[in-house]
């Protein structure tokens, strides 16, 4: 059975069809350097991911299976990591894994799903993408008997499992820490979001629900951050908002629904000398944690267990191809609040 050093017990949640949209391409500053790269080959839609070869297990249920790992966001650091973990684990079990990236193009993602279905892939893993956006193409996979798994995506009927974090709970955790511990229940806040992403939608729903409980906290603006270059775009957005709000203490905090815009916001604040403004994020990527440790404006994030999500997907695929019954729905990997006190 697949096990790549699981670090936590995963909880199974009831199946829930998420109505959100598409996962974020969280790219980090390496400006967006990736560990897994894709090179399209032929009509079979095979794509090769770079990286060290994993030791292969002969004769398992996954041996010889062709698995298509598909995402619109391979430039995202966390998406790239998940795709890499999945590729490594499945190849260790003898599967042939094709990582397919559509570079933020969802029409292309739909087309590529059609191609892998028609070419006879044995399984699909949708990474960091809302299945509602490609529901018709996934239905073709379901009709063809091809199992579809999600990794930090949404879940729709017909899929096997989506491994993710409890995004609403993460939103509650970081928003209450921001409002209570960092803002003291009063002030003004900017919301940096990307509501096409199903996880971000849930985090922002938590923000929207909780801010109603705080009459002394005012939302200045909600700003959409594009997924392609979120650090740079968030930096520009916040720089413009600082120009429009030049007085010290006119902005108390920036809530970023994932770490890349939090990093961009922090850069803008540092350049403007606005040390009084608080920033929080979600994901727990290395650059964000370093900024927290260094005592910058970025004060907290929620660290997701992306490796744990990949482990869940691979274990569930192993069970599926072994003929074992899978309890369909969402499975959650636990998340952790990171502050300067516990940042490592």
Where are the language model's segments positioned?
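A residue-level marker of the well-folded mature domains of exported/periplasmic proteins
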Residues: 2-12, 25-344
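Bacterial N-terminal signal peptides
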Residues: 13-22
């Amino acid at each position: 059975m697949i096990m790549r050093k699981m670090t936590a017990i995963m909880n199974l949640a009831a199946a829930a069809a998420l109505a959100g949209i598409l996962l974020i391409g969280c790219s980090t500053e390496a400006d967006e350097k990736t560990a897994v790269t894709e090179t399209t080959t032929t009509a079979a839609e095979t794509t090769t991911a770079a990286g060290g070869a994993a030791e292969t297990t002969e004769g398992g249920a996954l041996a010889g299976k062709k698995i298509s790992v598909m995402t619109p966001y391979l430039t995202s650091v966390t998406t790239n990591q998940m795709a890499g973990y999945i590729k490594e684990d499945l190849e260790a079990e003898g599967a042939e894994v094709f990582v397919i990236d559509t570079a933020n193009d969802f029409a292309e993602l739909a087309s590529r799903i059609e191609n892998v279905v028609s070419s006879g892939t044995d399984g699909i893993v949708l990474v960091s993408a809302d299945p509602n956006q490609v529901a018709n193409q996934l239905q073709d996979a379901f009709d063809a008997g091809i199992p579809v798994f999600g990794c930090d995506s949404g879940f729709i009927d017909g899929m096997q499992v989506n491994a993710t974090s409890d995004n609403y709970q993460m939103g509650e955790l970081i928003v209450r820490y921001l409002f209570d511990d960092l803002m003291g229940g009063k002030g003004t806040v900017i919301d940096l979001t990307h509501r096409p992403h199903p996880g971000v939608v849930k985090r922002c729903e938590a923000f929207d629900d909780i801010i109603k409980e705080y009459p002394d906290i005012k939302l200045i603006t909600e700003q959409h951050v594009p997924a392609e270059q979120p650090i740079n775009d968030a930096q520009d957005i916040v720089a413009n908002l600082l120009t429009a709000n030049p007085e010290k203490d006119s902005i108390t905090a920036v809530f970023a629904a994932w770490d890349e815009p939090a990093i961009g916001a922090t850069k803008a604040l540092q350049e403007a000398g606005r040390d009084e403004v608080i920033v929080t994020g979600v994901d727990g990527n290395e650059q964000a944690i370093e900024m927290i440790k260094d005592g910058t404006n970025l004060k907290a994030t929620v660290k997701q267990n992306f490796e744990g999500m990949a482990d869940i997907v691979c274990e569930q695929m192993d069970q599926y191809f072994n003929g074992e019954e899978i309890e369909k729905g969402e499975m959650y990997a636990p998340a952790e609040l990171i502050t300067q006190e516990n940042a490592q």
